[in-house]
Amino acid sequence: MEEKILMRVIVITVFLFIGAATAEDAAAEAYESPKLKKLITDCTGHVGETCSTTTSSSGSEALMQKQDGLALCLLDSMERCLLDHQTNVGTLGDLIILPPFPPRPPVDPNIIPFPRPPNIVPFSPRGRRSKLDNHQTDAGTLGKVIPLPPIRPGPPLKIIPFPGTNIVPFPRPPNIVPFPRRRRSKLDNHQTDAGTLGDLIILPPFPPRPPVDPNIIPFPRPPNIVPFSPRGRRSKLDNHQTDAGTLGRVIPLPPIRPGPPLKIIPFPGTNIVPFPKPYIPHSYNTITNLLGARRDQVQDLPLLIQTTQLRTVLGICSHVTARTCLTAPNVATSDLEACLTPSMNQCVYPPGAESGSPPI
């Protein structure tokens, strides 16, 4: 339970810090709507009654925990109340919902937005004659069409050396030794012209290899090795169909049986606690609900800015109200309920808000 409370406090503190940094340069028009002011005024009484069960306690640490818990209760209850009162989306339409953009004029298909410059010779993509070559297009659209003559093949290239040089082909080096092959080639049979390749060096054929004795194993396996087939099936060695004197003693292994499932044994004095699910406060769903109420309307940057300004003001005022009402001496339950409503209204709508100054 303490971990959940600590997680909620951390989440709301980080969110309020980001919101305060975002709303430093924000204008006051996001919370000066008279309709929204009436809704917040009506909701503060309900919020004060809901969160007034939190009583003050002695000690600075306990007091800070109470302040954070009360601030979270104020913010969450305020947004719940706003959502309950705005079942009709038209109530906050001037603040949240933006009108759609005007429709664009229809495009005339006869108007070419980017005409081609004149004196351009068109070519078909595959080199064939296109319709432009047959003069089947409107000359006023593309300008004057200049047909080009076909490209004729020219004479073959001829290498012309510099004056005083002779083109001599690269001669073959003499004394080429042909490599012997497994089969006898024509060079071994002396069926080539020796004057063409120069002095040929004929190598004698390799001596034939001695026959291989099948009973001799060049690399014997060490003893006490249990062979396995590559696919896990039983091979001939498992059936004892080989010569035991060649491979040594074959020791068959028993099959591996599946063991019991693993069990996590914690250290003495510790308890295995599953990782808690992340706490998502109700305030996170407020923007989604407000934006998803009217899918046919345009949602752009001003809409997000106004929503962020509104949530920032409510978040900051929740902390200010909690700090103001809980630090007063000898605060009882009835006094706390009476303190929440005027403190919340004064923070959200201070006297300078009508003149355009920021609330905090």
From Swiss-Prot:
Keyword S-adenosyl-L-methionine annotated: no
Q: Which family does it belong to?
A: Belongs to the nodulin 20 family.
Q: Which domain of life is it from?
A: Eukaryota
Provide the protein name: Nodulin-44
* Pfam families xref list: Nodulin
Source species, please? Glycine max (Soybean)
Instruction: Report the induction information.
Output: During nodulation in legume roots after Rhizobium infection.
What the entry lists under InterPro entries is as follows: Nodulin (IPR003387)
Q: Look up the record and give one Gene Ontology term from the biological process aspect.
A: nodulation
| Signal peptide, first to last residue | 1-23
Going by the UniProt record, its keywords in alphabetical order are: Nodulation, Signal
Q: Where is this region: Disordered?
A: 123-148, 228-249
